[in-house]
Each structure stands twice: as C-alpha cells, then as structure tokens.
Curated annotation (Swiss-Prot):
It catalyses: phosphoenolpyruvate + UDP-N-acetyl-alpha-D-glucosamine = UDP-N-acetyl-3-O-(1-carboxyvinyl)-alpha-D-glucosamine + phosphate. This is UDP-N-acetylglucosamine 1-carboxyvinyltransferase. The modification 2-(S-cysteinyl)pyruvic acid O-phosphothioketal is found at residue 117. It comes from Neisseria gonorrhoeae (strain ATCC 700825 / FA 1090). Its main location: cytoplasm.
C-alpha cells in the first residue's frame, strides 16, 4: 500500500496548475446517462473516483472513452443495464448520482446504497423523498435502492441543504413530464456547473445559482461539450500548504470567485493574496495567525477545507476555535495532528486549537480524503520525517499531489509498501 514520505524543505515557490473539480466531474459524468448523444467533458481530473465512475457507467452499458489526461467522451446511447452494483458503489458515495438520471430516462433504476469517506452519516433520504414526490415508487431491499415509475414535475422542498440531493433531483427533473420546482437547493459552484452543462444539453432551468430552481421537463436531451470548473478545494489545499511553509506560489486554472471566503481567511492568517479571473497568487512571509473557522453551506466556509485549516492553525500564533456544523465525526485528523505535537482538544462539534511553534514528524494514518490532505500540509512544516499511510483516501480527490507540491519545492515522495 502506498505511503507519502514528507520532510520540511523551506518555503514553496513556483506555479501549480489546479485540476478540474472532482465534485463537479462526477455528477457531470453521470449526466451522460440522460442522453443517447455524446457528452464531451474537458478538464476532468484523473482520480480514483473518476475511474470508479467510468467503470460504473461502462458497467451500465455506456460507452466511455478518455485520453487519460483530462478529457472524456460519454455516450449513453448504448446503456442496457439500469443496475449500479455494490462492488463499485461501495467505495464512492457519488455513485448514488446515477439514480436520478437512470430513473428519469429509463423508468427504473437499482443502485446499491453507497460508501465513501467515513465522516458521519450522510443519508440519501432527501434524494429518495424528492423522487417519490415526482412519482417514483421506491423500495430499499437487500442494500439496494429500487426505483421505478414515470417521473412528473412536482414541488420538492428539501428538508436540508444537500449537494448530492440537489444534483440528483435536478438531473431527474430535466426529463420529467411538466414543471419541477426545487426548493432549498445547494448553490455550490459544482451544482452551478452541472446546471450549466444540463442547459447546454437542452434542459430548461431557471434560478441557477439560487436556492430555488425551476425545471421545465424536456422530452430529450442531447450531447454537448463542457469544461469542468476548477477545483476550489484543491486550490485551497495548496494555498494552505504555502501558508504553513512560507513562500510565493501562483495557482493557474483557478477560480477565485468560487472560494472568496477561503481567501479571506488566508488573508486573516497573514497571507498576501492576489487574484485574476483564472489565477491566484499567495505570498507568505510570516508565521500564520490563528483564525476561527465555522463551516457552513456555500457561500460560507466549506467543510472540505476545515481539516487543512486545522493543520495551519496548529502551528499558528495564538489560539482559535474550529466549529464543524455540516458533518459529525469530522475531527478524525485531530488525534493524528496531536501525535505530531499539535495542541488540539475537541468538545462535540468544536475543536480548540492552541498554536505551537513547530510540529514533529511522525507516522500518521489518513482516515478520510480531506484529513489526509491536512496531514500532508502538517508534514511540510514538521521537524523530521512524516509518513502518511493509507493515502488511497488522498488519491480519491487529489491528482498527483506529490508531483504538484514537489514542483514548487516540497520534499515529498510516494513509496510502496
């Protein structure tokens, strides 16, 4: 099993190209099931979850071609299987996103209940409730969601803001008969990206980027070409890496307007930030200052950046509180950071961080995707060698992270065994 060996190597300097967003690419790939035409996606990150989604779509009969760099062609005209099996779905929560488009187009779907990161119960009840409101008959049998029925437009008010639920219901509504009103929608950039692609495919959607979207069902959707939005979480992770080591790095193919709250927090921590339409520059010449964090739904501070800022705060000047309001059980990186010398205590959904001068390298275990990123960041500033184990979590969401960080001066190496 691969590991990362990391040693502090001073400030980071240079340029990094940000990949396309995993959280946008996966639903966009699933949208290929809505049409018999060809969906051409560009700026797709080559990640484990993308490969799993490719296998899932191919297992359903779709034709999926890739250049293995950043482009995919998905043709749903050959789909002949409406079942998404446990063997593939168990490793990735986003697999549930085939449910809405498959049901809407074929009138039936079977999807195994999903797996993915172990960061609390992220139920799919909002997905199912919305589909039932649109006329689906749904049963859960032997670990599978079994859905059937011709979907019709309806008013769907989600009880909680859910990114996956919004995406699943949005895709389903594009082929439903009549008008669907989706209320309490997630407004994350990745949701907006999906909606904009669906419009290119022929969907009629109003209210994109707001909490209420109205979808006029189309009889048919068509192929199109679409470029995946840049990954704001990957960009934020690299910015935290520079903030903890010092130095100056420019991120290319970035989308600063999608991550303004993260940039504001980095400025509060002492970084100098400059940005253009598609680039972000960070210059850090001092010890970071501790910053309070409270995760909330977009456009607030993203839960997917909480762990990275926890690592930054661990060596910051002063003390702070980090409050996690989105997921329970998302402080699993705290014991590992404390093993490296951090001074962090937790009480319920709040972590109290007292910054220390320096962390010490240690063997640590990744427990989920973003927790693994926080351990990499901590290792870049720790005295001695840090070994991050179980980095298969990292590979689910970061494309060549060791190569990208190495290109700007980080001492980081992937090793086997």
């Amino acid at each position: 099993m691969d590991k990362l060996k990391i040693s502090a190597n001073g400030p980071l300097n240079g340029e990094i190209t940000v990949s396309g967003a995993k959280n946008a690419a996966l639903p966009l790939m699933c949208a290929g099931l809505l049409t018999s035409g060809t969906l051409r996606l560009k700026n797709v990150p080559m990640l484990a979850d993308v490969a799993t989604t490719q296998k899932l779509l191919q297992g359903m009969g779709a034709r999926v071609l890739t250049d293995n760099i950043s482009e995919f062609e998905i043709n749903g005209g050959t789909v002949n299987n409406t079942c998404a099996p446990y063997e593939l779905v168990r490793t990735m929560r986003a697999s549930i996103l085939v449910l809405g488009p498959t049901l809407a187009r074929f009138g039936e779907a079977q999807v195994s209940l999903p797996g993915g990161c172990a960061i609390g119960s992220r139920p799919v009840n909002q997905h199912l409730k919305g589909l039932e409101a649109m006329g689906a008959e749904i049963a859960i049998e032997h670990g599978y969601v079994k859905a059937k029925g011709k979907l019709k437009g309806a008013r769907v008010a989600m009880d909680v803001v859910t990114v996956g639920g919004t995406e699943n219901l949005l895709m389903a509504a594009t082929l439903a008969e009549g008008t669907t009103v989706l209320e309490n929608c997630a407004i994350e950039p990745e949701v907006v990206d999906l909606a904009e692609c669906l419009v290119k495919m022929g969907a009629k959607i109003s209210g994109i980027g707001t909490s209420t979207m109205i979808v006029e069902g189309a009889g048919e959707l068509y192929g199109c070409e679409h470029s995946v939005v840049p990954d704001r979480i990957e960009a934020g992770t690299f910015l935290c890496a520079v903030a903890i080591t010092g130095g100056r790095v420019v991120l290319r193919n970035a989308a600063p307007k999608t991550m303004e709250v993260v940039l504001d927090k980095l400025v509060e921590a002492g970084a100098v930030i400059e940005a253009g339409d598609d680039w972000i520059a960070i210059d850090m010449r001092q010890r970071p200052k501790a910053v309070d964090i409270r995760t909330v739904v977009h456009p607030g501070f993203p839960t997917d950046m909480q762990a990275q800022f926890m690592a930054l705060n661990a060596v910051a000047e002063g003390s702070c509180r980090v409050v996690e309001t989105i997921f329970e059980n998302r402080f699993m990186h705290v014991p590992e950071l404390n093993r490296m010398g951090a001074n962090i205590t937790t009480e319920g959904n709040t972590a109290f961080v007292q910054g220390v001068e320096r962390l010490s390298g240690a063997v640590v275990k990744a427990t989920d995707l973003r927790a693994s990123a926080s351990l990499v960041i901590a290792g870049l500033a720790a005295r001695g060698e840090t070994v991050v184990e179980r980095i298969y979590h990292l590979d689910r969401g970061y494309e060549n992270i060791e190569k990208k960080l190495g290109s700007v001066g980080a001492n980081i190496e992937r090793v086997s065994g």
